[in-house]
């Protein structure tokens, strides 16, 4: 817990609304309306009863600060999984009390300023922790205590400018620099000289976008915690903030496989596009919108937005993003059975992708899917296997899907392939660990078809899981694969049924895309 003394702060208000403070004489925690009680004394050298003068650290060490605070580190009770946290109650120079909770392990801000903190965490027993800290310290395992100066405050305008720089690094995919900005800004948020809900909402949105960026190289799912922290009311009268809110919300829906919801949110964001003046940000949005239309099999709209994105990205020399656009254009040609044109696009992009391992691996994976579409399973196997050797692709979420694809094409060629069975179980376990529903179903259907020889009841139940989650694209693809399997087994009635299902849901996705227009 961090409780700031009144050094360097505005005078304490009278009556209700006063905050707990550390007495300079007794070293006790004084709480309005409660008797004075002993408080853990700070462990810095020198007398602890004397309050440091404004802007002066103990023993004459000069520092710029807005006050002093007692900082307690502690382990949370079991319901917070025993992670290390620091809880603080900070008195700002602008007569406002700030509450927050910092995770020591990741240095990420988990709380917001002001009363909203309690509103956000009331259902998670955070008030209980606060009471334990303030009035029942003997029940909480305090791990350390120290007197530290509060860092220099920062204005919302300067913090907002920092966040803009951070977001630019994210858009340009400068991962290391973006990570540095994340760590720096995560600390600066605690030093706001006055609360600004718009800046905090902007911070939460960019933090979520950062998580989407780093997900490419981490085998874990992105959680919408920072997105949920945004006060939607703050976006109503701010066009740029509204754009970012709907854009990021759309990305999360797409990430979760809810393509219809994602496209709806993207179309709302498109109405706010005039408030965006950064051309690279516009290009990123058009790319995501084109990607969403591709998922709906609305290829005309997808190509239009992807070409707009390429034009804007070329002006900013964002090579890797141009490669991603070209990857989708080639995938569209594959879906339209224009295999020769798709091959030229893929090979051209592949030649430029060597310096970008993440995109390089995705291109190899896309080439594997292209070969699956053409029933060239051996070539598909080679591309999937090569993709897993590039960069950190094998450790990423997309890498789990590639492992499932590789196991699938190997088992389709030889159902007794022990290495393929091992790889399938590895992909299945990884997908289960992070609740990657689509990959879990793909693994289960591969197992049912090629290891358990087409058990109808298992196939039906797994496909139903996709329908319940509205994964219509995945349903269509897997139904088509099942139809091909039964066709090879000369079970034409079953093959016809599943092919009809595949066509139905492919058409359904096209209709949804038209409705969004």
Curated annotation (Swiss-Prot):
Its EC number is 2.1.1.72. One of its GO terms (molecular function) is DNA binding. The keyword DNA-binding applies. SUPFAM superfamilies: TPR-like. The keyword Repeat applies. Residues 51-62 have a biased composition (Basic residues). TPR repeats lie at residues 283-316, 361-394, 476-509. GO terms for biological process: DNA restriction-modification system; methylation. PROSITE patterns: TPR, TPR_REGION. It comes from the Bacteria. InterPro entries: TPR-like_helical_dom_sf, TPR_rpt. Residues 1-21, 33-62 are annotated as: Disordered. Keywords: DNA-binding, Methyltransferase, Repeat, Restriction system, S-adenosyl-L-methionine, TPR repeat, Transferase. It catalyses: a 2'-deoxyadenosine in DNA + S-adenosyl-L-methionine = an N(6)-methyl-2'-deoxyadenosine in DNA + S-adenosyl-L-homocysteine + H(+). It holds the Pfam family RapH_N. A methylase, recognizes the double-stranded sequence 5'-GATATC-3', methylates A-? on both strands, and protects the DNA from cleavage by the CeqI endonuclease. This is Type II methyltransferase M.CeqI. The gene is ceqIM.
